[in-house]
From Swiss-Prot:
Keywords: Cytoplasm, Developmental protein, Differentiation, Disulfide bond, Golgi apparatus, Redox-active center, Spermatogenesis. One of its GO terms (cellular component) is cytoplasm. The keyword Kinase does not apply. It comes from the Eukaryota. It is found in: Cytoplasm; Golgi apparatus. Residues 1-92 form the Thioredoxin domain. Belongs to the thioredoxin family. This is Thioredoxin domain-containing protein 8. Increased levels, possibly caused by overexpression, are observed in morphologically abnormal spermatozoa from infertile men, suggesting that it may be used as a marker of aberrant spermatogenesis. It holds the Pfam family Thioredoxin. Testis-specific. Only expressed during spermiogenesis, prominently in the Golgi apparatus of pachytene spermatocytes and round and elongated spermatids, with a transient localization in the developing acrosome of round spermatids (at protein level).
């Protein structure tokens, strides 16, 4: 099941509930075409991977949370364990981007775009 997150407090509660398990958060918008294509995929993954926590944040309804999580484009998927973003990268381009913007000390795994295969592969890897 995909939990709908409406604000920062719900987000913190969601991450706390996930604890040591993987939490996958989709930042999206109901008006975004690629986001619409990913909704059924994301839901299907939540059914398939019962031991993973899944949540969706609509950036139009939660702009403060989107800003706090540094969401620049949608859909964006971030993965967490123990309330911390997972420290893996899938592409060198992302590392360079974070290095240039000063985030090298807080490396994260996230990716943007509607790539269902990549999302599922990374979820399996991090479980």
């Amino acid at each position: 099941m995909v939990q709908i997150i409406k604000d920062t407090n719900e987000f913190k509660t969601f991450l706390t509930a996930a604890g040591h398990k993987l939490a996958v958060v989709q930042f999206s918008s109901k008006r975004c075409g690629p986001c619409k294509r990913m909704f059924p995929v994301f839901h299907a993954m939540s059914v398939k991977y019962q031991n993973v926590f899944f949540a969706n944040v609509d950036v139009n309804n939660s702009p403060e949370l989107a800003e706090t999580c540094h969401i620049k484009t949608i859909p964006t998927f971030q993965m967490f364990k123990k309330s911390q973003k997972v420290t893996l990268f899938s592409r060198i381009k992302r590392i360079i981007c974070c290095y240039r913007s000063g985030f090298m000390s807080n490396l994260i795994f996230e990716f943007c775009g509607a790539d269902a295969k990549k999302l599922e592969a990374k979820t399996q890897e991090l479980m």
